[in-house]
From Swiss-Prot:
One of its GO terms (biological process) is type B pancreatic cell proliferation. It comes from the Eukaryota. It is found in: Secreted. This is Osteocalcin. The carboxylated form is one of the main organic components of the bone matrix, which constitutes 1-2% of the total bone protein: it acts as a negative regulator of bone formation and is required to limit bone formation without impairing bone resorption or mineralization. The carboxylated form binds strongly to apatite and calcium. The uncarboxylated form acts as a hormone secreted by osteoblasts, which regulates different cellular processes, such as energy metabolism, male fertility and brain development. Regulates of energy metabolism by acting as a hormone favoring pancreatic beta-cell proliferation, insulin secretion and sensitivity and energy expenditure.
Amino acid sequence: QLINGQGAPAPYPDPLEPKREVCELNPDCDELADQVGLQDAYQRFYGPV
């Protein structure tokens, strides 16, 4: 059963989700994240995760 039209809830909150959203807004960070992973890409652009 869907709740609030959001689909199934995540089994646990993703602590990196806010950083993922920031990185996705930067095309260079987003592209790098596809290659090396979110944490490494985020660190290169924005500092420690």
